[in-house]
Amino acid sequence: VMFSLFEEQIKHENAAIEHLITSGVESYAESLSFFPELEDYETGPDEYLNLLRRATEAVDIPVIASLNGITNEGWIVTARLMEEAGASGIELNPYYIPANLYTDGREVEQRYLEVLKAVKAAVSIPVAIKLSPFFSATGNMARQFDEAGADALVLFNRFYQPDLDLEEMEVITDLKLSTPAEIRLPLLWIGVLHGRVNASLAATTGVHSPLELIKYLLAGADAVMTTSGMLLHGIGFLTTLVSGLRDWMETRQHDSLAQLRGSMSHANCLNPAAFERANYIKILENYKAEYK
């Protein structure tokens, strides 16, 4: 999966060049023929699409483009360009913070569904959507995305949150990489959704060793994604993950991924209550016991 192309990048670059070309045209109209048209520049998605084309030509594995947009038009036009550039699939990466106090949950959910439906109608390649972890009913939204045609659900979008600098008295917008402790929320919902939706389930966040990869697969993930691990350890981290998974499977005599995938999901584990509220009190009691 490639990094996301942002609709704002497209709009900003196009608007900036348009301004440079047309600003003050009334004062030198006769010289306009010396200036190139906006289309002559490689702006907006052009560099991304060129990289996408080169990637699909260079590797034998599927290359999935990722799109972060804010309007239906922005999603649709760019999604079509990605398909034409050779993408094997598209990941929709909605990043929407409903800061308006008058925007209710149904409106937010409907916006996500409309985007998915619009892109599905515009392209013929598979479309995945990255879910927010803040839906009031995650299972219900997963079902609606599934019924709307999503080919895969990516759990979850990791919204970047600001901090405050107490010395400079300003908002800090730095990037904090994930940690292994963050796998628990996506692990919960992948375990719950496994076998209950037709869409494939992709896990993301917190994969820093083969252990997290194995846990996601046991919960029911069809695919496991990692970014922080790659940034910290480089390309060789992929070999570490695959080797660790293979060693674990051989030790436990698993012959295939299909054999272990979902074997500890909500539907298949010996204690399904561990995924739900029934285990809540036990967790608190165990924690208290450790610190007596």
Q: What is each model feature region?
A:
Residues 193, 227-229, 242:
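Short, small-residue alpha-helix embedded
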Residues 223-229, 233-234:
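Helical hairpin unit composed of two closely spaced alpha helices linked by a short loop
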Residues 202, 225-226, 258-261:
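Conserved active-site loop/cleft motifs that coordinate metal ions or position small ligands
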Residues 233-252, 258-292:
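C-terminal extensions of enzymes
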Residues 2-30, 43-64, 68-203, 208-224, ...:
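Alpha/beta enzyme core
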Residues 30-39:
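Short glycine/proline- and acidic residue-enriched helix-loop micro-motifs
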